From Swiss-Prot:
Glycans are attached at N134. The gene is IL10. Its main location: secreted. Homodimer. Interacts with IL10RA and IL10RB. SMART domains: IL10 (SM00188). Residues 1-18 form the signal peptide. It comes from Orcinus orca. This is Interleukin-10. Belongs to the IL-10 family. It is found in: Secreted. GO terms for molecular function: cytokine activity. The lineage of its organism: Eukaryota, Metazoa, Chordata, Craniata, Vertebrata. One of its GO terms (biological process) is immune response. Gene3D superfamilies: 1.20.1250.10. GO terms for cellular component: extracellular space.
Length: 164
């Protein structure tokens, strides 16, 4: 066997072995996902506490953005999908607008966003443990109300982040 062919075979086998090792690592981290979730949620709450007062003081609306039906979706078979959609909603629609309230707020909102991204990544990586298939009507309702509130929606959504 020519040395270049042997080298190619060795490289191929090394990649296969590395891929299997990475797959095992991802699988192992997913096994521990339920145990690490409370810690991740505590980190999110701690990050949110840095901006909570600001957004609560600036939310002048009496209505609630997050509804009982969303809570029911979180608890039901749509739980993972509703959570995934809400994370995407906050990362793509709420937080970019929330960052526009000064450099100090932006720093804390960015930190909160990074923790949400980490949670979203873990949810995606461990999707076998949490089926995410159907769209949540409650999340669609939240998005609709948020858009109707226009610039006041960001205060409402950020104020209610801890409910989410």
């Amino acid at each position: 066997m020519p040395s270049s062919a042997l080298l190619c075979c060795l490289i191929f086998l090394a990649r296969v072995a590395a891929g299997q090792h990475q797959g095992t690592q991802a699988k192992d981290s997913c096994i521990h996902f339920p145990d690490s979730l409370p810690h991740m949620l505590r980190e999110l709450r701690a990050a949110f506490s840095n901006v909570k007062t600001f957004f609560q003081m600036n939310d002048q609306l009496d209505n609630s953005l997050l509804s009982q039906s969303l809570l029911e979706d979180f608890k039901g078979y749509l739980g993972c999908q509703a959570l995934s959609e809400m994370i995407q909603f906050y990362l793509e629609e709420v937080m970019p607008k929330a960052e526009d309230h000064g450099p100090n707020i932006k720093e804390h909102v960015n930190s909160l966003g990074e923790k949400l991204k980490t949670l979203r990544l873990r949810l995606r990586r461990c999707h076998r443990f949490l089926p995410c298939e159907n769209k949540s009507k409650a999340v669609e309702q939240v998005k609709s109300v948020f858009n109707k509130l226009q610039e006041k929606g960001v205060y409402k959504a950020m104020r209610e982040f801890d409910i989410f």
